[in-house]
């Protein structure tokens, strides 16, 4: 267990009937000592791969949460993600449910208390321990679910539906928008949105390429679900996959890859996921296939893409974001 997980366990009631562990796989063994029944929800495929599959929930829904009387939750970075999780727990868990959540103090704000307070009658905070702090909640308020949420973007001609865990939720962030404006002119028979988020790029590619096979991949369950909802709402077909790597995909199977790669994992900056995505692209693109990438302009991705994928040119740029096109060797 890391310090956040240790604090969750330390601040928890000694016993429960059914513990649900949310995005904190290191707590599984402690949960087994605390309750006869344990379930685990992992949004991130990389976390899910570290625990026994028999504990993993297939969905975070009413049937999965029924009877849960204790929730151990790692606080997410985004308030929207906490709001989405909290409203489902409050709506569907046992009326006696107690939530013990924690995070690193540098990443916490008082707004997290406010979010929990929208869904629970009682919210309290622990003292700081090892630069972490716990938030406890009880007394769930049963309310109509507000997630996932839809927003129309007339300038792109689409609506976006997203869960709270998805980056930018149902908005279109400035980087994605810069690449999205090019999607009507990106064509191929086999296309992939790598790190699909809410499915904006995949949906636009499917619209621009009727009859083509458009796939989308993300490590986040919420992103995959949101992509499917967004595609369906816009009347296009997209195959969405929950995956952390594409080792099982055959080489040279794609004509086009588009991506807005992450450079954070949680609250920590991490370039490795983006570099791994570039490696996947190099293997999956057919010779002459194209990779379209949008990234923060200060990052050295043009050079890394040229090294890993092939000749790379800047297609569009502003002071904040750059779109590059790489041609696979």
Which role does the model predict for each range below?
Residues 1-52, 174-259, 265:
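Conserved SAM/SAH cofactor-binding pocket of Class I
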Residues 36, 94-97, 211-212, 289:
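A short helix->loop->beta-strand "cap" motif at the edges of active sites that frequently abuts
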Residues 56-67, 240-248:
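Short acidic low-complexity segments
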Residues 58, 100, 126, 161, ...:
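General small-molecule cofactor/ligand-binding pocket signal
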Residues 68-74, 254-262, 292:
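Short SAM/SAH-binding signature in class I
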Residues 79-154:
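N-terminal auxiliary segments of SAM/dcSAM-dependent transferases
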Residues 86-87, 99-120, 127, 268-327:
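Conserved Class I SAM-dependent methyltransferase catalytic core
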Residues 130-190:
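SAM-dependent Rossmann-like transferase core, predominantly class I methyltransferases
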